[in-house]
């Protein structure tokens, strides 16, 4: 199962306590938009909706609980998953935390979550950027296998794909979320130097990257941002 923590929005951070609130089972664009606005703020995110998601997974959540180094600022942040985002703060005492999300095959992948965010870029701005951390249950036991959790971020046009179900290869020419070495954010593509057990401390996951920044050039006006959590195999 893949989990991605996104940077916080505006607010007052809570030092203790807090909660994780699932938005995944709600079809209301209002609730999905509310979660997405923790990534970029209400002035930047006009609306948001799922372009794809597993039918049984709680794949999107807003959290006010300190976890994995988030929130970086403000009081809340977004959690995007291809399984169950509400399990993120569970103790790591299971070999495989997750859920049977029932995702159909999409472009050669299973359990695909695509969040479509309609954003507005003000005049004078030319960069879209957000901070994130990738966490996974498939490290290290599934490194090099067909099960290859991943995270992609695209702008306006979505072109990622995999060769076929059972093939771990991910092609994403328009992706702008990479690790510090420029690799795709996947279990197979992000090596031991970037995914470690220590970085997942305090979560239910077995491995995580450091906090990373995704950035891409953008022109003023309306755009569509598409963060994607997926699982080839």
Task: Give residue spans per PLM region.
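Aromatic (Trp/Tyr/Phe) and Gly/Pro-enriched flexible surface segments
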Residues: 16-233
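Bacterial N-terminal signal peptides
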Residues: 1-8
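Sec/Tat signal peptide C-region and signal peptidase I cleavage site
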Residues: 9-14
């Amino acid at each position: 199962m893949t989990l991605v923590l996104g940077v916080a929005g505006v607010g007052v951070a809570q030092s203790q306590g807090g909660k994780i609130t699932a938005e995944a089972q709600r079809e209301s664009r209002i609730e999905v938009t509310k979660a997405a606005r923790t990534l970029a703020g209400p002035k930047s995110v006009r609306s948001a909706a799922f372009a794809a998601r597993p039918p049984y997974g709680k794949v999107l959540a807003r959290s006010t609980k300190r976890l994995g180094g988030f929130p970086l600022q403000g009081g809340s942040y977004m959690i995007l998953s291809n399984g169950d985002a509400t399990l993120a703060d569970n103790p790591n005492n299971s070999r495989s935390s997750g859920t049977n999300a029932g995702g159909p095959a999409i472009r050669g992948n299973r359990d695909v979550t695509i969040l479509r965010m309609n954003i507005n870029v003000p005049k004078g701005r030319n960069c879209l950027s957000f901070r994130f951390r990738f966490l996974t249950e498939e490290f290290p036991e599934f490194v090099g296998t067909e099960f290859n959790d991943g995270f992609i971020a695209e702008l306006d046009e979505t072109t990622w794909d995999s060769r076929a179900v059972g093939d771990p290869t991910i092609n994403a020419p328009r992706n702008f979320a990479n690790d510090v070495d420029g690799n795709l954010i996947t279990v197979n593509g992000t090596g031991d130097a970037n995914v470690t057990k220590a970085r997942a401390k305090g979560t239910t996951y077995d491995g995580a990257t450091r906090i990373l920044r995704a950035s891409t050039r953008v022109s003023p006006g309306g755009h569509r941002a598409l963060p994607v959590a997926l699982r080839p195999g």
